[in-house]
Amino acid sequence: MPDSRATTPPVVTPATVDDSLPVGAPEGPAAEHAVRGNGLDPTLPAVLTVTAGSKRRSRGRGVVFWLALVWLAVVVLVALTASWLPLSDPDKQDLVNRLAPPLSDGHVLGTDGLGRDILARLAFGARVSLIISVSAVSIGMLVGGTIGLAVGFFRGWFESVTMWALNVVLAFPGLVLLLGLVAFVGQSLTAITLVVGFLSVPVYARVARATTLAAAQRDYVLAARALGASNRRIMFGEILPNVALPVAAFGLVALGVVIVLEGSLAFLGLSVKAPDPTWGSMIAEGRQHLSTTTHLAFIPALVMFLTVLAVNFVGDVLRSRFDVRESRL
């Protein structure tokens, strides 16, 4: 009498897969027959191959992420401790040693057209760039995020009026409006920070509004409304935690944009006034000697490029990590 008990499917182990599909095994029907002979799904090797490739890409992305994070940590540390590091005075002129090449005696990265040490000016220029960019991004996130949260939550006429005003600001060419405001309020560190922060408010408000609209339709928010929770409790207890992370991740990406923006202002001579060094002003000064000493413009441009690249990569990884829509892809 035949056995009516159901057969137990074989357990799939790495050894089973390796034995069924050895390296160099034939593809096509022969390979499929070998796999079916062991009771395995013929699509399993392809799935395992895709998974292995994804793991390799993820591992490589993780290495680049940590390299970018280390570079940013070094830049921030140098900017914060520039006054205590064994560096030359960034404003001290030595006309005898002007335009010295890199690795010169006492000047690791050489000197500029006035004999000032490039390494010292890079370190102190990093401080100016980071102060302006971090402060401006913080202002934009705080003010714009609050506006976007309120607009997305209350809706109605308040949303219409507020978004109309923000769209009017966004309609102006950003660089032209920035140049006009800087020329009007002055070129102090505080003035430039406030102007750049003000111009970034509409962008953060739109991001916060879109995230708030999506979070307001979640089941836990609807449940809180049904239980009689106040608007304040729902806004700050339920919606704000879900809005803060995407806005902060977007702010990290925008940090690179602000660094380039400040560098552009300095290149045009509209950032902080001399003799305070900035990366953009160093590039502008090196432009005059491109035919003879290219390192004057190349070194600060390279430092700015690597910093912005690291900020963009870290911000993109964090944004995809905390963005619910992308984390499911």
Residue ranges and their predicted role:
Residues 118-153:
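Transmembrane alpha-helix signature in integral membrane proteins
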Residues 170, 181-185, 196, 210-212, ...:
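Glycine-rich helix-loop "coupling/hinge" segments at transmembrane-helix boundaries
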Residues 108, 112, 118, 142-144, ...:
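Generic hydrophobic transmembrane alpha-helix motif, especially the helices
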Residues 72-89, 125, 164-188, 256:
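Membrane-water interface segments at the C-terminal ends of transmembrane alpha-helices
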